[in-house]
């Protein structure tokens, strides 16, 4: 069987570092039109805020979302579809992370 890496040459288009101090947050957003988003947690303190993802639960009639919570840990790498909306509520502990957008790129 072939995986995504066998068919596409992946490319990181944006890469940025973020440092959250106590009380800082990020508003709800997505990284569309990228294919995937990722974050690597370099250094997080106890009490740092989680990432809250909105996962669509569309039944064809109602447009509902379920919230998925990701609690950062030192050395954690998280990758998700860039179309998912997410936010970071005000943090109580410092966190340093590197975020990026990943695109499938051109077919091999």
Predicted segments with their positions:
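Catalytic core of non-heme Fe(II) oxygenases with the double-stranded beta-helix
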Residues: 10-79, 83, 89-90, 95-97, ...
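Short, small-residue-biased leader/transition segments that mark boundaries at the very start
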Residues: 1-8
């Amino acid at each position: 069987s072939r995986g995504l890496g066998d068919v596409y040459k992946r490319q990181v288009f944006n890469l940025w570092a973020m440092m959250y101090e106590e009380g800082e947050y990020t508003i709800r957003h997505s990284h569309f039109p990228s294919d995937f988003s990722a974050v690597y947690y370099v250094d997080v303190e106890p009490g740092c805020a989680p990432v809250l993802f909105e996962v669509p639960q569309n039944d064809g009639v109602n447009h509902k979302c379920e919230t998925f919570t990701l609690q950062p840990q030192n050395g954690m790498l998280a990758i998700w579809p860039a179309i998912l909306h997410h936010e970071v509520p005000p943090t109580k502990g410092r966190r340093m992370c590197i975020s990026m957008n990943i695109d499938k790129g051109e077919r091999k």
